Amino acid sequence: MIKKNYEELVSFFADDEFILEMIADAMKSFPEYVNRVYSMETQMAIISVRYDGEERANRIASLDQKRRDAHEVAIGSCKMLNRLAEEAGVEKFCPETDDRYVVGDFCALITSEFFASGKNYNSLDELITNMKESVKGGINA
């Protein structure tokens, strides 16, 4: 559903290179936020065993700031894409909120939906179940 609405938005602005560039940049912000969360979570475990005291705190604070910055960009991207969708008369596909948790969940959802493009799943749950089974088979092989 998100992808369909996104494609309608892009089609509406097909002749406006500047707007298309803005849309492309906004869409990049969602997987970038997901990547920042992933990076922070994986690096924190390493930082926790390698550093103590102030050095540990500084490194974790730096990771958290990068994640927060990416989150703010994603929130701004949602607002901009919703304004463009309204202008185009197409259904908005971003949440209309400043709630950090909602926008964070949206970033994961939209990234998953585009990742699953071309695969025939009826739901995100089905996609995740299938992905877990696929990875499990590869790990135990």
Predicted feature descriptions by range:
Residues 9-32:
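Short, charge/polar-rich alpha-helical segments
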Residues 14, 86, 114, 129-132:
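Intrinsic disorder/low-complexity segments in short proteins, especially the signal peptide
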Residues 10-11, 111-112, 141:
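N-terminal leader/targeting segments
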Residues 1, 25, 63, 116, ...:
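Short, low-complexity interaction segments enriched in Ser/Thr/Pro/Gly
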Residues 1-8, 129-141:
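Short intrinsically disordered terminal tails
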Residues 8-9, 26, 102, 110:
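N-terminal leader/targeting signatures
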Residues 35-124:
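Acidic, low-complexity, intrinsically disordered interaction modules
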